[in-house]
Amino acid sequence: MDDVAIVSFNDSVIALEHFSYNKDNYALIISDLRMPNLNGLELLKKVKKLNPTVRTILLSAYEVDNDAIFQQYMKEGIIDSFMEKPVTISDLCQRVRDEFQVYQLASYVK
């Protein structure tokens, strides 16, 4: 993970616009569920349409296991990983490493 750059946005619409112009430069997107304009589910669905190989982590402080849309997005691979907040830095770093490993393995298979 030496060549990793972190880009942060506080507006999901601007984040999506940026991603649409740079979609091949991303391996991982981390999003919160509750955001103004586009929520995390909507954002990650649009991200996966632009680049199906990008890995996604959804964060939320809310119970989502019983949410039908959440379950469907997990089955469809729109959400690759879910973490319930509060999240520790060490847990988040480990999950990021795991998702990068999956991304790299998938890149070798191509």
Q: Locations of the language-model features?
A:
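Two-component/phosphorelay signaling modules centered on CheY-like receiver
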Residues: 1-7
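Acidic, metal-coordinating helix/loop segments flanking the phosphotransfer/catalytic sites
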Residues: 8-28
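Hydrophobic/aromatic residues positioned on beta-strands within the core alpha/beta folds
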Residues: 59-61
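Short amphipathic alpha-helix used as the core "switch/output" element in two-component signaling
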Residues: 17, 41-53
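C-terminal output helix
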Residues: 84-96, 100, 104, 108
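Receiver (REC) domain active-site loop signature in two-component systems and cognate sites
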Residues: 35
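Active-site residues of response regulator receiver
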Residues: 32
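Alpha4 helix (beta4-alpha4-beta5 surface) of REC/receiver domains from two-component response regulators
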Residues: 42, 63-81, 90, 94
